[in-house]
């Protein structure tokens, strides 16, 4: 978003500080100042008041304006047809500059012109953003300015425009008030959004019947405010197109507070508005899309946000509608319209009720200043922002995260600054600012703490000297590639409806998320591999071996395998190749898994994974999975093996015995195999046959080894 540095400094009471210092502080606060642009290169311009207008008799399209300035009366010629007597103008007078051009008195068609009247374009504004009133000639306005005053200061024209890139999880930052609040806290000046109140002069009788999943708040206002010229210029600096009074007012609220809004007017007998979703069609477009419609009591549309605005009568009361629409619906509308307006972009962000509260408290101040009456908020109550989430404080963890030695005084001073932007602290916990959606974990608080403690202080932190150690090479990717697996990468986030969670991990619904398909942290990597496998099967790829290693819910690190080629027994062997642990496999009792083909994996009686196939309801037949929680496995120490002993070479031929296990359908062979595998010097145990007879599993294994192995097996059977 584009911000006026002059307005930010004015709001935050930073006129005593240099432009560069304020810009540097924004960067230190973590805001990316992508570009700095000077609005114009003009100097020496003056306010003037037109006393008289007459035509230049020697020119077809020139008018001679007698203009009163603070020091004298001057005659200035212009071709603009919108000049009016007794109105004020801006003018370059002799000695004024625009870039490398210095203005002088000059003779035009037989008459001296002592300067030039100024248009909006000559002030540095984009011609395509001007409405017809601003673009019809020179700037003409009511005589409200002191002719002695400096237009560059009064109209904030000596300005730098900052292109500030905000993180996607800081929608509140698209607001002059929020940025000014953080600057004031940083510089310790007198400005705060906190502890503001909302009120009203009367109670509105409007009832909003909301038949959608969106939230709608409103304010009844007795008269449409007209923005001051300096605020119109502020909209232009933000690259907002100037429209009618209602559009300008709504856009001004947007850039000041971050709250999108629409103006709605009702006839006097109307006291009810209905919000529905309904198909809408654009002229010359074949497709339709479902969008929001505000209907009157006769079910006729009054307002279709982003499709058609209502014409607002200037001196009649109206309603300022402040929505929080469904984010997915906004995204669809944005794609359909191929439109990227500031309002539509903000509607697609996950701002919270705190942003609405900031808008309401600002409107209280703004409308009172304009002497316009307004109602108490409709549908909004301060309790919406008073429900606070508290997180535990741990200052030792804070020091560890930041890598800084912090004194109690450092912590107390910085927390006092953080209170100015809305933090609340007690001895053991804190709550984040009411308008922030990005503070979910203690580490988020630590990041804010560092912003206001001072990033530059990280320079004083000396790195400790540590002894270097060459790490052991990670052979897992090599082993997996050798076994025929291909690596995949999937989204960390899944939709709220996806509940595949065989290991019963705890996830967390995020307050901010990129889309409705990605709202919480995944429970299982195997689930992601299942979706990738099905996608490839649709592409007629039948032989699939995939693996992924990554994070899942509960701060766990996981490895998952998926195969349409290997059996579950093969996957067990691969697990042994990857991690030389003595795993136990027990029948899996889970609604998410196929009970006849799945097992839980244990290590030292700790559940560390699962193996087999997912439940039939998911329709992933003939795909075998293995998922292991590496974060749990790594916490369990490996049992040290005994000393290696060498024996004389035995060149006798290996022999084998075939044994068959007869097991119930839900039983697994692993406990029985463990007994057999305790026989010393077994060379191999191989599955050679598996059949089901009379609802019994008949599983045949071939055990290969020297004579003493076969003797032990024979003795075991006897």
From Swiss-Prot:
Any Gene Ontology CC annotation: cytoplasm
GO biological process, one term: phenylalanyl-tRNA aminoacylation
Record-linked InterPro entries: aa-tRNA-synth_II/BPL/LPL (IPR045864), DNA-bd_dom_put_sf (IPR009061), NA-bd_OB-fold (IPR012340), Phe-tRNA-ligase_IIc_bsu_bact (IPR004532), PheRS_beta_core (IPR041616), tRNA-bd_dom (IPR002547), tRNA_bind_bactPheRS (IPR033714), tRNA_synthase_B5-dom (IPR005147)
A Pfam family this chain is assigned to: tRNA_synthFbeta
Residue ranges of every copy of the tRNA-binding domain listed in the record: 39-153
CDD domains on file: tRNA_bind_bactPheRS (cd02796)
Domain B5 positions: 386-460
Keyword set, alphabetical order: Aminoacyl-tRNA synthetase, ATP-binding, Cytoplasm, Ligase, Magnesium, Metal-binding, Nucleotide-binding, Protein biosynthesis, RNA-binding, tRNA-binding
Subcellular location(s) per record: Cytoplasm
SUPFAM superfamilies attached to this UniProt entry: Class II aaRS and biotin synthetases, Nucleic acid-binding proteins, Putative DNA-binding domain
Primary location class: cytoplasm
GO molecular function list: ATP binding; magnesium ion binding; phenylalanine-tRNA ligase activity; tRNA binding
Binding residues for Mg(2+): 438, 444, 448
Entry's cofactor comment: Binds 2 magnesium ions per tetramer.
Residues spanning the signal sequence: none
Annotated protein name in UniProt: Phenylalanine--tRNA ligase beta subunit
Lineage: Bacteria, Bacillati, Mycoplasmatota, Mycoplasmoidales, Metamycoplasmataceae
